[in-house]
Amino acid sequence: MNVLEVMKRLDDMPESYKTMSMEEMEVRVRAIKERFGKRLFIPGHHYQKDEVIQFADATGDSLQLAQVAAQNSEAEYIVFCGVHFMAETADILTGDHQKVILPDMRAGCSMADMADITQVERAWPILQELFGDTILPLTYVNSTAAIKAFVGRRGGATVTSSNAKKMVEWAFTQKERIFFLPDQHLGRNTAYELGISLDEMAVWDPHTDRLEYKGDIKKVKVILWKGHCSVHENFTVRHIEYIRRTKPDMNIIVHPECSWDVVQQADYAGSTKYIIETIRNAPSGSKWAIGTEMNLVNRLMHEHPDKEIISLNPYMCPCLTMNRIDLPHLLWALESLERGEIVNQITVPPLIAKDAAQALARMLALA
């Protein structure tokens, strides 16, 4: 069975939803939301399509949405418009009476999938042999529940792009070194901002089971997992150079999941929330080239017509896996609920959920 056949099997939505008009689907979704009332809660990630985000009861980043879902204790059903790891986090943080549903099971995250738990468990004893008991693991919330649990069992914590600096500082009060999963770029950019040189960072390659470093291994303070965001890695220094040459008065703002070179040459770098707030607070008439996911960039263009906003990469595509969540899948999930049928429920095994919750709790305690 090829990859396309596997992906198709993961999608159980009837064909009839694909031929329905947008207007009819919108009417049906609104009616279901009204009938369910507070029993239904729909979180929508910033990177979702407008056709979906219009029905979100809350918008935000992955952790923020999971927390808001947990606070809505009256909601029996959390229909999470995001990707798989986000729905897992929501399941970990919400109550036992709440059911988390992902409208399309094909909505994964390539970066989260780059840190497989088997690979991580294979790497850990090798790193322990190299450095002894001097390493604390940290994982970006953009990771699977199994990775969060691995980190939680070893005294580590999760981080977000908003609090990564604070969490790395905390980690160094616990151990001499950190093992940062799964996004090497966020880890590198954060550590560098804290004054750690590139020579004091190493990269663990899970495909060769080797540590890549320059200089003295004894001076390594940060071990970065060799993972990345497929969207943000598509912004390059050449894109920045082109903007500087053709639009010298344009501000460049990027997400810290971009490479170190890109972040260093940008005018501003920060989380999705930071980007949104920076654009919102910018003066009318200001010009911005944004290095992040295209659905969000398009939304910012629409919300701020008084500002000139473009994508840093003019040929950028939206996050393909995030884009799996569309109006037909949302409607299908909701109508299934009305029939008493729960489709695509996300359930994290209790032992994994318990350890993953510890990693999340350590971070939230420092918030």
From Swiss-Prot:
<comment type="pathway">
    <text>Cofactor biosynthesis; NAD(+) biosynthesis; quinolinate from iminoaspartate: step 1/1.</text>
</comment>
<keyword id="KW-0479">Metal-binding</keyword>
<dbReference type="InterPro" id="IPR003473">
    <property type="entry name" value="NadA"/>
</dbReference>
<feature type="binding site">
    <location>
        <position position="62"/>
    </location>
    <ligand>
        <name>iminosuccinate</name>
    </ligand>
</feature>
<dbReference type="GO" id="GO:0005829">
    <property type="term" value="C:cytosol"/>
</dbReference>
<keyword id="KW-0662">Pyridine nucleotide biosynthesis</keyword>
<feature type="binding site">
    <location>
        <begin position="255"/>
        <end position="257"/>
    </location>
    <ligand>
        <name>iminosuccinate</name>
    </ligand>
</feature>
<dbReference type="GO" id="GO:0051539">
    <property type="term" value="F:4 iron, 4 sulfur cluster binding"/>
</dbReference>
<protein>
    <recommendedName>
        <fullName>Quinolinate synthase</fullName>
        <ecNumber>2.5.1.72</ecNumber>
    </recommendedName>
</protein>
<dbReference type="Pfam" id="PF02445">
    <property type="entry name" value="NadA"/>
</dbReference>
<keyword id="KW-0963">Cytoplasm</keyword>
<feature type="binding site">
    <location>
        <position position="109"/>
    </location>
    <ligand>
        <name>[4Fe-4S] cluster</name>
    </ligand>
</feature>
<feature type="binding site">
    <location>
        <position position="319"/>
    </location>
    <ligand>
        <name>[4Fe-4S] cluster</name>
    </ligand>
</feature>
<feature type="binding site">
    <location>
        <position position="229"/>
    </location>
    <ligand>
        <name>[4Fe-4S] cluster</name>
    </ligand>
</feature>
<feature type="binding site">
    <location>
        <position position="45"/>
    </location>
    <ligand>
        <name>iminosuccinate</name>
    </ligand>
</feature>
<comment type="similarity">
    <text>Belongs to the quinolinate synthase family. Type 3 subfamily.</text>
</comment>
<comment type="function">
    <text>Catalyzes the condensation of iminoaspartate with dihydroxyacetone phosphate to form quinolinate.</text>
</comment>
<dbReference type="InterPro" id="IPR036094">
    <property type="entry name" value="NadA_sf"/>
</dbReference>
<dbReference type="GO" id="GO:0046872">
    <property type="term" value="F:metal ion binding"/>
</dbReference>
<dbReference type="GO" id="GO:0034628">
    <property type="term" value="P:'de novo' NAD biosynthetic process from L-aspartate"/>
</dbReference>
<dbReference type="GO" id="GO:0008987">
    <property type="term" value="F:quinolinate synthetase A activity"/>
</dbReference>
<keyword id="KW-0408">Iron</keyword>
<keyword id="KW-0808">Transferase</keyword>
<feature type="binding site">
    <location>
        <position position="161"/>
    </location>
    <ligand>
        <name>iminosuccinate</name>
    </ligand>
</feature>
<feature type="binding site">
    <location>
        <begin position="140"/>
        <end position="142"/>
    </location>
    <ligand>
        <name>iminosuccinate</name>
    </ligand>
</feature>
<keyword id="KW-0004">4Fe-4S</keyword>
<keyword id="KW-0411">Iron-sulfur</keyword>
<feature type="binding site">
    <location>
        <position position="272"/>
    </location>
    <ligand>
        <name>iminosuccinate</name>
    </ligand>
</feature>
<dbReference type="InterPro" id="IPR023515">
    <property type="entry name" value="Quinolinate_synth_A_type3"/>
</dbReference>
